[in-house]
UniProtKB/Swiss-Prot annotation:
Enzyme class, UniProt record, top EC level: transferase
GO MF term set: transferase activity, transferring alkyl or aryl (other than methyl) groups; tRNA 2-selenouridine synthase activity
Protein's UniProt name: tRNA 2-selenouridine synthase
Active-site residue list: C97 (s-selanylcysteine intermediate)
Signal peptide limits: none
CDD domains on file: RHOD_YbbB
Catalysed reaction equations from the record: 5-methylaminomethyl-2-thiouridine(34) in tRNA + selenophosphate + (2E)-geranyl diphosphate + H2O + H(+) = 5-methylaminomethyl-2-selenouridine(34) in tRNA + (2E)-thiogeraniol + phosphate + diphosphate; 5-methylaminomethyl-2-thiouridine(34) in tRNA + (2E)-geranyl diphosphate = 5-methylaminomethyl-S-(2E)-geranyl-thiouridine(34) in tRNA + diphosphate; 5-methylaminomethyl-S-(2E)-geranyl-thiouridine(34) in tRNA + selenophosphate + H(+) = 5-methylaminomethyl-2-(Se-phospho)selenouridine(34) in tRNA + (2E)-thiogeraniol; 5-methylaminomethyl-2-(Se-phospho)selenouridine(34) in tRNA + H2O = 5-methylaminomethyl-2-selenouridine(34) in tRNA + phosphate
PANTHER family per the UniProt record, alphabetical: TRNA 2-SELENOURIDINE SYNTHASE
Any one GO biological process: tRNA wobble uridine modification
Quaternary context: Monomer.
């Protein structure tokens, strides 16, 4: 235990997926947390706010006394039992608060009184967060190769197959387009960046890394934006472009957005509620780009989408969706991506069908 008490190699802690018993208030945890952390607060949001106000008006001693009055008796015991259960479940875990200050020390002392000696993170979440930021900046300096291509080209699958591939969309829980959301809500910006940093550290530790393989992304993936240090490096990176037949792209999109998403929604919510959520998901994706489509074209495609959904509901066929997906690709997504790719034409080092790009990557 003495070694663990002193062990503050933050990178090693992140690499090991070290369980963190994060005792910050829920609002702090939601704003940013490390992968693998569980939130078991010493004080809830309202309690923390009251203590903070007291600190400003009456000083540290009065604030500490108020905190002990707010977290006492049954409340204290309930929270103590939760921390004990977490430590029993994760005996290699660490306590963590914002800066390694009073909150984690108080919880540590209360646990010690029950016979549990749980170490804490010196410097707290802030120290781990700074380590994550520094790691991303350092590892982003390695060479990068981008995988480009129009929507439905199988870029994400190609990235996932590479031992040095980083699935940015998977980390962001979003596939990048207006239809890109998944059933899992996106993380906060800080939590996304922390998760990305840990992924980079893990991949880098597994192998002698020549370069990263990433999907050619914009500045944002849904609500998350890429760290600027990584985005700057990606803007200069060589690109391998997947150019598959249009029909093959349509089949990939059918599988991903109409078959799999319908399955995921109904599996999560049941047939009726799942169908409603799936329908709203497709409508929301189209609505998000209504201004770029023009309101008349948006209305036309919405009518076509409604007919396609009715057909899918009655027969299970997804063929009707092609009547709005094809023009959406031809009129919006493909021209937009090709315009963006033209601006980076000098960076293109290879282009060809999916399998040719996969073989080219393997030969590098």
């Amino acid at each position: 235990m003495q070694d663990r008490q002193k062990a503050q190699d933050y990178r090693a802690l992140l690499l090991a997926d070290t369980p963190l018993i994060d005792v910050r208030a829920p609002i702090e945890f939601e704003q940013g947390a490390m992968p693998g952390a569980i939130n078991l607060p010493l004080m809830m949001d309202d309690e923390r706010a009251a203590v903070g106000t007291c600190y400003k008006r009456q000083g540290a001693d009065a604030a500490l006394a108020l905190g002990h009055r707010l977290v006492c008796g049954d409340i204290r015991q309930q929270r103590l039992e939760a921390w004990k259960a977490a430590y029993q479940r994760f005996p290699n875990g660490y306590l963590c608060c914002a800066r390694g200050g009073q909150r984690s020390h108080i919880v540590q002392r209360w646990l010690q009184e029950t016979g549990i000696d749980c170490p804490l993170i010196e410097g707290g979440y802030k120290a781990l967060r700074q380590t994550a930021i520094q790691a991303t900046w350092q590892l982003a300096q390695k060479p990068i190769l981008l995988i480009g291509g129009c929507t439905g080209s199988g870029k994400t699958q190609l990235v996932r197959q590479q031992p040095n591939g980083v699935d940015l969309e998977g980390l962001a829980r979003h596939r990048g387009s207006s239809f890109g959301r998944t059933l899992n809500p996106q993380l906060s910006q800080a939590s996304f960046e922390n998760k990305l940093a840990v992924e980079l550290l893990k991949i880098n530790a597994r192998q002698t890394l020549k370069r990263w393989v990433l999907e050619d992304e914009g500045r944002t993936i849904g609500a998350n934006h890429l760290p600027e240090c990584l985005r700057e490096r990606m803007a200069q990176a060589p690109i391998a472009v997947v150019e598959d037949p249009f029909a093959l792209r349509l089949e990939r999109l059918r599988e991903e957005y109409f078959i799999r998403m319908h399955h995921d929604f109904t599996h999560a919510y049941g047939d009726e509620a799942g169908w409603q959520a799936y329908s709203e998901y497709l409508h929301h994706g189209l609505f998000a780009i209504r201004r770029r489509l023009g309101l008349q074209r948006f209305a036309e495609l919405t009518d076509t989408l409604d007919r396609a959904l009715a057909e899918q509901l009655s027969s299970g066929s997804t063929d009707g969706h092609m009547a709005w997906l094809v023009p959406l690709l031809n009129e919006y997504y493909d021209p937009m991506y090709r315009y963006q790719l033209e601006k980076k034409a000098a960076n293109i080092v290879f282009r060809g069908p999916w399998q040719d790009v996969a073989n080219w990557l393997k030969a590098q």
